[in-house]
Swiss-Prot record:
Homotrimer. Pathway: Pyrimidine metabolism; dUMP biosynthesis; dUMP from dCTP: step 1/1. HAMAP family: dCTP_deaminase. GO terms for molecular function: dCTP deaminase (dUMP-forming) activity; dCTP deaminase activity; nucleotide binding. The record marks G114, W115 as: Important for bifunctional activity. This is dCTP deaminase, dUMP-forming. Keywords: Hydrolase, Nucleotide metabolism, Nucleotide-binding. It comes from the Bacteria. It catalyses: dCTP + 2 H2O = dUMP + NH4(+) + diphosphate. One of its GO terms (biological process) is nucleobase-containing small molecule interconversion. It comes from Sulfurihydrogenibium sp. (strain YO3AOP1). Bifunctional enzyme that catalyzes both the deamination of dCTP to dUTP and the hydrolysis of dUTP to dUMP without releasing the toxic dUTP intermediate. The keyword Metal-binding does not apply. The active site is at E127 (proton donor/acceptor).
Amino acid sequence: MILNDKTIRKYISEGLLEINPLDDIQIQPSSVDLRLGNEFLIYPEDIEIIDVRDPYFSNRLIKEIATEEGFIIKPKQFVLATTIEYIKLPDFLTAFVEGRSSLGRLGLFIENAGWVDAGFEGNITLEFYNANSIPIKIYPGMRICQLVFAKMEDRSEKPYRGKYQGQRGTTASRIFLDRD
């Protein structure tokens, strides 16, 4: 069941769902608008290969802090970013990260791993791809995506406690920690 605005507000007021900071204007009929943080991770153009087993690969990413003047995503560029909001989901809610259609219509694809497991806590790392042939300029603090909440039939027996639990800011891939 997708949560409506009334239930989202109720869960927040009861402390079951945490989203910080949050202004009531961000709560939509069936989602919550999340805003863009100012921290970006960029893949350098001189990287020849990404080795998923290399635990030091993320050290090669370039960290940029955007100002109110904005951040430019080049054509065909992939960039990691973060939300301002820190969220904490209970063990009976899951969430989907959805890009805003207004940005999609400009060619900016937001997230390609948009599932948030029950029990997750942290900032949401966003994956951006500029599919356009011209640069796109975005700004810290702007509404960048929507979080849609779904109530599960029952509480999760094993809520999320994975490698991204508690992440703050833009977080690079930690795939090298996978056991498979």
